[in-house]
């Protein structure tokens, strides 16, 4: 938690300048660089990289 206050961001993306305080945030960010759309709508052809994009 203290990393949030200190400004220290030890996790860095190797594809852009993104930095963050924890590994899970980096893993989520790395999806933005991929072409994998693993979450699909059951009612249409929409697909997304992030599960929260399917929620109402």
UniProtKB/Swiss-Prot annotation:
The keyword Ribonucleoprotein does not apply. Its main location: nucleus. GO terms for cellular component: nucleus. It comes from the Eukaryota. Coiled coil: none annotated. It is found in: Nucleus. The keyword Repeat applies. This is Protein hunchback. It comes from Locusta migratoria. The gene is hb.
């Amino acid at each position: 938690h203290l990393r949030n206050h200190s400004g220290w961001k030890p996790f860095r993306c190797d594809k852009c300048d993104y930095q963050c305080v924890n590994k899970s945030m980096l893993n989520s960010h790395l999806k933005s660089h991929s072409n994998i759309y693993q979450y699909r709508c059951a009612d249409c052809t929409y697909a997304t990289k992030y599960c929260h994009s399917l929620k109402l």
